[in-house]
Regions:
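Thiamine diphosphate
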Residues: 1-170, 175-176, 184-186
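Short, flexible coil/linker segments at domain boundaries that flank nucleotide/cofactor-interacting
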Residues: 28, 196-198
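Short hydrophobic beta-strand segments
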Residues: 34-37, 200-206
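Phosphate-coordination loops involved in phosphoryl transfer and adenosine-cofactor binding
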Residues: 54, 198-200
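A general structural motif
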Residues: 64, 178-194, 202-208
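Short, conserved, surface-exposed binding loops centered on an aromatic residue
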Residues: 160, 193-196
Length: 208
């Protein structure tokens, strides 16, 4: 029998909760950070952001193509725009805008897909985003980041703020086990980490 490893911090949060809290703290110190949402303040955990920094959030409504277009326009003027929307809709409805207005234009929009994968559960297949990796990996000039835990999420958001390139961040809804016990390991795009060493089998995974 294999050994069951319990590695869940009692204070573990959903990665998208950590994303929103980190973005709020960074935005307090940087007025160029702007959150753009598609009627997703609640699901994107941006209610506190809107209440605290009402001049740094733009509500588009349920219009994902317009969401990305507005974020692209803001980014082109020097704003650090985070376009926040459920991953299932952001990466399907707004694909043309992501491709042309963001990636191919080398426009540093921070695309944020929330409730990714099957996070929406009972809402059904219309709300599941099993396609976003495949779709976005086919687009040149777009970095894709799916943090594994709260530590990586916080570091990824800080990196995204300071990266002047198009980027896609992918977050789920469930509290995540803490896989990073030593913050000194740092965070780097494209660099994997060994969680546990063994000799019987190799398991390679990403994200949540």
């Amino acid at each position: 029998m294999g050994e069951v490893i319990q590695n869940i911090n009692e204070n573990a949060k959903a990665n998208q909760d950590v994303f929103a809290a980190t973005l709020l703290e960074l935005a307090k110190a940087d007025k160029n950070i702007v959150a753009v949402t598609s009627d997703s303040r609640g699901s994107g955990k941006l209610v506190a952001f809107g209440q605290t920094l009402p001049k740094q959030i733009v509500e588009i409504g349920i219009a994902e193509q317009n969401l990305v277009g507005v974020a692209a326009g803001l980014a082109s003027t020097g704003k650090k725009a985070f376009a926040v929307s459920p991953a299932c809709f952001l990466t399907a409805r707004a694909l043309e805008q992501i491709k042309n207005d963001v990636a191919y234009s080398d426009n540093p929009v921070r695309l944020v897909g929330i409730s990714a994968g099957v996070s929406y559960g009972a809402l059904g297949t219309t709300h599941h985003s099993l396609h976003d990796y495949a779709v976005l990996r086919a687009i040149n000039n777009l970095s894709i980041i799916a943090p594994a835990d709260n530590f990586e999420t916080k570091e990824a958001v800080k990196l995204a703020v300071n990266q002047d390139k198009p980027i896609y961040l992918r977050f789920g809804k469930k509290p995540m086990p803490l896989l990073t016990e030593d913050p000194q390991v740092g965070f780097e795009i494209g660099k994997g980490r060994v969680i546990r060493k063994g000799a019987d089998v190799a398991i390679i995974a990403n994200g949540e």
